[in-house]
């Protein structure tokens, strides 16, 4: 299964494509779509759409994992973020991909075992789980990869008809997480 994770933003949009097969997780591609602040918002949305479409065409994901909207005190920022999300949703529908949305707390819980984890903790666990180091220096990328991982972990949980210990919403302790991912333990 291949999933495209998207961390939307009006100036930087993170993306990460993760494959899960019998040998585990692997990153097919990841990065940040950097948008020039001098361009109109409509031009930036068009750029996001086109660049993500190229990524979809080259990596062939079956699903898109998108971060849900968070409440913002700045209405203008929230509207712009909503428009970026709309472009990603439209692209998902136009390319016949399943779209799944996850709240930041749900992603944090799936990847670290704690819904209140910091960005640093999420980045650490994402790079460990995907066995990538060094070249990922942006939280936009680790957040997008975390979204893809969250989706893949949720698929696995649904397929097994019972949540894996330490990953489900109900079990937020490290013991359950270590049982679910023994290969992550450094001895």
UniProtKB/Swiss-Prot annotation:
E.C. number(s) listed in UniProt: 3.1.21.10
List of residues binding Mg(2+) 1: 7, 140
Keyword Chaperone attributed: no
Domain of life: Bacteria
GO molecular function, one term: crossover junction DNA endonuclease activity
GO biological process, one term: DNA recombination
Entry note: cofactor: Binds 2 Mg(2+) ion per subunit.
Record's keyword terms, sorted: Cytoplasm, DNA damage, DNA recombination, DNA repair, DNA-binding, Endonuclease, Hydrolase, Magnesium, Metal-binding, Nuclease
Binding site residues for Mg(2+) 2: 67
Database matches in Pfam families: RuvC
Oligomer status and interactors: Homodimer which binds Holliday junction (HJ) DNA. The HJ becomes 2-fold symmetrical on binding to RuvC with unstacked arms; it has a different conformation from HJ DNA in complex with RuvA. In the full resolvosome a probable DNA-RuvA(4)-RuvB(12)-RuvC(2) complex forms which resolves the HJ.
PANTHER family reported in the protein's UniProt record: CROSSOVER JUNCTION ENDODEOXYRIBONUCLEASE RUVC
NCBIfam families: ruvC
Described purpose of this protein according to its UniProt entry: The RuvA-RuvB-RuvC complex processes Holliday junction (HJ) DNA during genetic recombination and DNA repair. Endonuclease that resolves HJ intermediates. Cleaves cruciform DNA by making single-stranded nicks across the HJ at symmetrical positions within the homologous arms, yielding a 5'-phosphate and a 3'-hydroxyl group; requires a central core of homology in the junction. The consensus cleavage sequence is 5'-(A/T)TT(C/G)-3'. Cleavage occurs on the 3'-side of the TT dinucleotide at the point of strand exchange.
Stated name of the protein: Crossover junction endodeoxyribonuclease RuvC
């Amino acid at each position: 299964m291949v999933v495209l994770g998207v961390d939307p933003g009006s100036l930087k949009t993170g993306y990460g494509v993760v494959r899960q097969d019998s040998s585990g997780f692997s990153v097919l591609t990841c990065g940040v779509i950097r948008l020039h602040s001098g361009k109109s918002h409509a031009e930036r949305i068009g750029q996001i759409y086109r660049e993500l479409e190229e990524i979809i065409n080259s990596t062939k994901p079956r699903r898109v994992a998108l971060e849900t909207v968070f409440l913002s005190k700045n209405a203008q920022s929230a509207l712009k973020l909503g428009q970026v999300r709309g472009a990603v949703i439209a692209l998902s529908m136009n390319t016949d991909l399943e779209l799944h949305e996850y709240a930041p707390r749900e992603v944090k819980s799936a990847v670290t075992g704690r819904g209140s984890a910091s960005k640093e903790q999420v980045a650490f666990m994402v790079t460990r789980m995907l066995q990538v180091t060094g070249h990922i220096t942006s939280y936009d990328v680790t957040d997008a990869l975390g979204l893809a991982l969250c989706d893949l972990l949720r698929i696995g949980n649904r397929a097994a008809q019972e949540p894996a210990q330490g990953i489900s919403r109900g079990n937020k302790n490290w013991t359950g997480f270590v049982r679910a991912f023994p290969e992550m333990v450094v001895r």
